[in-house]
Regions:
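A structural signal for multi-pass alpha-helical bundles of membrane permease subunits
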Residues: 3-276
């Protein structure tokens, strides 16, 4: 009986291990394909897309760097990502804190409003967003920043709300008795206690903003990394080599950021869901 149960357990582990390997290969192969082809001439890629480079060809990186004007679009994208993510975190954390600690009944209605907005697809509101951006003279790269604040806050508020509810109110009351003001309590007591969910929101929103294509296409038209990569996708000819090189270069910063904070993602989402 024990032998049978151990055998079944071993079989399950083998199946699980094989499944994980298959899924890992499935997700890693596209990245491997892009990196390998970034070192191959465009003619070789067209003839044999899945081949390996005969020798290291760095011309794709030189072409991508020049044609994309990479330093400029990189700084633009970095500015939008940092300011957009930072604004979402500060605004959403303060809003969620106000909703959690508010004694007004309308607070629950406002929270339900934010939660409901999560189910609205972006494609439904992208035309009104374009019209609004034009009316507010936000049709530029800096104009993307307040747009991301508005689009990213509902999800962040939902995540912060569940986490802030777990913060003991007695800590805030003790600080208030000692004369601490609301802003001091929020920034010095509440925020340090929710740093896990802050890191989670930072990673999720940074990945979203850095990789976003549709909103910059509607609002900015040009000036970000994702839009600059369109120049390699012509109507009659595609420069696969420089395209792969540009994808490789642009992926390095956000992958490094994700790897640095990845441990907070599952921890923060799981804790926020349970505490919410």
């Amino acid at each position: 009986m024990n032998f049978s149960s151990k055998s079944n357990e071993s079989s399950k582990k083998v199946v699980l291990g094989v499944s994980l390997v298959v899924f890992a290969v499935f997700f890693i192969y596209p990245l491997f394909f892009v990196v390998v082809n970034s070192f191959r001439p465009n003619a070789d890629i067209i003839i044999k897309p899945t081949g390996l480079p005969v020798k290291m060809f760095l011309g794709n990186y030189v072409q991508a760097w020049k044609e994309m004007q990479f330093p400029r679009v990189f700084l633009n994208t970095l500015m939008v990502t940092v300011l957009g993510t930072g604004g979402i975190i500060i605004t959403s954390a303060m809003c969620a804190y106000g909703l959690v600690r508010s004694e007004w009944k309308i607070a629950s209605v406002l929270y339900a409003f934010f939660a409901f907005s999560l189910v609205i697809p972006f494609q439904i509101i992208m035309v009104p967003i374009g019209v609004l951006a034009a009316d507010l003279h936000l049709m530029s790269v800096p104009g993307l920043i307040p747009m991301y604040w508005g689009l990213g806050c509902p999800t962040a508020i939902f995540m912060f709300h569940g986490f802030i509810k777990s913060v003991p109110k007695e800590l805030e009351e003790s600080a208030a008795i000692d004369g601490a003001e609301k802003f001091y309590i929020f920034f010095r007591i509440v925020l340090p206690l929710i740093k896990t969910i802050i890191a989670t929101v930072a990673v999720i929103d940074a990945l979203w903003i850095w990789n976003d294509f549709l909103l910059p296409l509607i609002v900015a038209k040009q000036g970000t990394i994702q839009l600059a990569q369109m120049r390699f996708n012509g109507q009659f000819m595609k420069d696969y080599g420089p395209m792969c090189a540009s994808l490789t270069i642009s992926s390095i910063p956000i992958i490094a950021f994700y790897l640095a904070l990845q441990k907070y993602i599952i921890k923060g989402i799981a804790a926020g869901a349970v505490k919410g």
